[in-house]
Regions:
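Active-site acidic-Proline motif in GNAT/NAT acetyltransferases
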Residues: 102-104, 108, 137-138
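C-terminal "cap" of GNAT-fold acetyltransferases
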Residues: 90-94, 129-132, 136-140, 156-176
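Conserved acetyl-CoA-binding loop-helix of GNAT-fold acetyltransferases
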Residues: 107-121, 144-148
């Protein structure tokens, strides 16, 4: 997927991509919104290796800006448990996650353009009815970005984060 100087390419099972992810997961501004802690190289490889496979249920794309990796974006079909958690009844619903790992490139539209590229793909090629993004409630820049992409706040919910702490999330949806 491509839009001018933004390219979304599949994450590769190689040292270069894993090392880039490790670099980004060392940034507090990144890991505090996703894993709640720094990840080691092996943890990153164990998490992302299955997502590099063609039949992955959670395809991950490296976001490249001017041919340089700057973040990742991924999607997955929402399962029944999460539909209940999010209070969504539609059948073909996908959840999107994104982060721009290069902090100097925050707030310049790359995230918005990347989300719009993936959204178009999911609506056009996967026949998505609804797209969902669920940022932490305190991640105001992400919420603003998603609103600029046409996502609207549906509700708030509490659930455990990746290390078991209860967190407040915002469920945002974009309909086709």
């Amino acid at each position: 997927m491509k839009d001018k100087n933004i390219t979304l390419r599949r994450l590769l099972d190689n040292d270069a991509d894993y090392k880039m992810l490790k670099k980004w997961y060392q940034e507090k501004e990144i890991y505090s919104h996703f894993e709640q802690r720094k990840l080691t190289y092996n943890e990153i490889k164990n998490k992302y290796l299955p997502r590099t496979l063609d039949n992955s249920l959670i395809p991950v794309f490296m976001i490249e800006h001017n041919n340089q990796p700057i973040g990742i974006i991924q999607y997955q079909l929402i399962n029944e448990d999460n539909k209940k958690l999010y209070n969504i009844n539609n059948d073909n619903c996908y959840e999107i996650d994104i982060f721009i790992g290069e902090l100097k490139l925050h707030n310049n539209g790359i995230g918005r353009r990347s989300i719009n590229l993936l959204s178009k793909y999911l609506f056009d090629k996967k026949n998505a009815d609804i797209l969902v993004m669920c940022p932490l409630k305190n991640n105001i820049p992400a919420i603003r970005c998603y609103e600029h992409c046409g996502f609207k706040i549906l509700n708030e919910f509490k659930t455990k984060d990746t290390i078991g702490n209860m967190q407040d999330f915002i469920c945002m949806i974009r309909e086709n």
